Amino acid sequence: MAAWSPSAGTRSSCLINNGITETWRFPSASFLTGKNKTKRGSETLVVTRKHIYRDLGSYGLSKICASKTSVELKEEHVSTRGAKVHDLKKVASYLFRTKSGALVKVKVEKKREKYSIMVYVSSLEPNGADNKSSLVMVWGVYRSDSSCFLPLDFENSDQDSQTPFLKSSLSELMLELEFDGKESPFYLSFRLKLVSANDPNGLEMLTHRDTSFCVPVGFTAGHPLPLGLSSGPDGDSWNFAFFSRNSKRVVLCLYDDSTTDKPALELDLDPYVNRTGDVWHASVDKTWGFVRYGYHCKEDVHSEDDEAESIVLDPYATVIEKFLGSLFQNSSFDWGRDVSPNTPLEKLIVYRLNVKGFTQHKSSKLPTNVAGTFSGVAEKVNHLKALGTNAVLLEPIFSFSEQKGPYFPFHFFSPTDMYGHESAVNSMKEMVKRLHSEGIEVLLEVVFTHTAESGALEGIDDSSYYYKGKDSKSYLNCNYPVVQQLILESLRYWVTEFHVDGFCFINASSLLRGVHGEQLSRPPLVEAISFDPQLARTKLIADCWDPHDMKMPKEVKFPHWKRWAELNTRYCRDVRNFVRGRGVLSDLATRVCGSGDIFTDGRGPAFSFNYVSRNSGLSLVDLVSFSGPELASELSWNCGEEGETNKSAVLQTRLKQIRNLLFIQYISVGIPVLNMGDECGVSTNGSPLLESRKPFDWNMLASGFGAQITQFISFMTSVRARRSDVFQRSKFLKPKNIVWYANDQTTPNWEDTASRFLALRIRAKEQ
């Protein structure tokens, strides 16, 4: 045996090849090779093979052409003897066609601890061959990189190392190879050659695609559906399915350690066997004990810059560990008798909160492993009930970029780990179960229009998943079929797995754009969500606020199919304008009665989610405390003095203005949405930026302001509940049942911008 030097030669390879005796450079590897030894007898050919052990370098999450699993080819058998039936465990068959029309069938059988590979060739009509021509197979195996296949130099190779076929019938040739099962998984790659005494170089035969034949050993081709990770039909294997239309190569990277960044095994998926349409797939036995997985994609099959490219996360992974998919699935959860409150839309009273900010402050008096988590929200359910809340609207909880914040997700199927001390998944389920038991629904803000700049879908198939906007930013291609499917599957998953009651779609106007960014009158995604049977009982809310912009949302005519409610931006504008003394009575009257100018299109007033402040922009107390020139878009008024003050008159005016804003909000027909912290006067010192928001300070509830405003909100929600016939309506009031008054009990001057008084009388019973 002779040792090869890793520095020898000029070309890297990760193939064990039959018949090659030249030296080649293998990066970070050592291996031995021996001269082929051939012994003939009784239709059996025994050949000693090479052994490779690959040592992984420290490449972080970079693609490396390596495998630390040993591959040792023990023996090769060429025999016409049939296999015993009781030895057969699993059989996979592959059928190929050559360019000349011959059929090549390959059967991979698991026999106890070995793999038997039988190759059958039929319909062979060699051109220019004589009667002494024979068919041989030159083959090799590889794992991590199919482009490392060594060139088969038949002229310089020892002919004894070539494996001949034997006749199994008049029209069929056959050979059999056998490998030790512990050396799997790997690919067997081979070419056929017709040789004769007159033509020692032989006639090479490839597939009809002009490529080598290739079959997986120790794993199977798998199935293209469902996308993502799923269990095989017998529960003993993992099926991997991954969409990438423009990738020429996709490598499945498997990890056997949850702490390392280096793959234990890489399988370069074959585009003929492991690809159906635009989906790459493979099935791997669970017994190997892998714990994580990812993919490496290359759009240029000839690129040599493998190590510079990152390993990407499966978009459908439901459990994430260190930016890789986990092969440990979610543990079962006892939902008990959990049932959604299924509150009618018109009866909702919504509280918007940030999971971390709600209980992160030390004043929450929660243990450190509970504060700032889903469990923390569940612990504060009594505060929500005191406000009359029957639905919480959670700011995005998907795994997101910690640098950019929750409105820039990098994944759509898992809650962020920072919201659960041990298991964010179980922590969230416990929260939902607890809130449901108290009659509180759970609504999620979701972002499906853009992603974080890294760690998301980038590197998988950018031209399919993204499009460039006019601002040169990358936006998620929502209405492209595969992206639409991803979003639908995500929504269904949150409903079925986490019992979520509804969704508020941030930057909803971008859901209306086509694959090139053009405006669509009938966007496929919005329509599909509207009529999806699994989402039929969920509440759907469109919010046109753009996290990139941070300004007040633009008004967009949203296609709704009588299913979609909307965060009513026009309501916010008109109420703020009236309270600060700039609006007209007609606008306020329209908002109080349910915004008929927006929702008389087959929906109703209950589809209007009414807010006067939100998590971006000025908080409620800042709306009456700051109004500098830079805050012109906020439509605020400082009540006579900018910022903090000790002047009693200014403070009394501010308190009155806050009560005015809340009073209008809670007597308006539609759904009131209160923002976290507004009940106790949380301030950002006049900053409208989302990142300026402070955690909820629970001590402020005991202050004079906090106690008064909390009691006022509680009173207003009880009024709404008692007179649901007036304030919680699914249909608009008829004009004849509403009587309006000015301050002198005359008909109001609707367009008088100086008027500051408006009264109304409602006949609750329809006439």
Identify the role of each PLM range.
Residues 242, 248-266:
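Beta-strand-rich binding/interaction modules
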Residues 317-324, 515, 521-689, 727, ...:
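Conserved alpha/beta catalytic core and glycan-binding cleft of carbohydrate-active enzymes
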Residues 137, 242, 295, 353, ...:
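Conserved, mostly hydrophobic/aromatic
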Residues 129-133, 243-249, 288:
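Short proline/glycine-enriched turn/loop motifs at strand-loop junctions of beta-rich domains
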Residues 47-129, 144-235, 263-266, 274-365, ...:
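The feature marks proteins involved in alpha-glucan
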Residues 1-55, 60-67:
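N-terminal chloroplast transit peptides
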Residues 354-534, 597:
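Substrate-binding/active-site clefts of carbohydrate-active enzymes
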Residues 237-248, 743-767:
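Carbohydrate-binding surface patches
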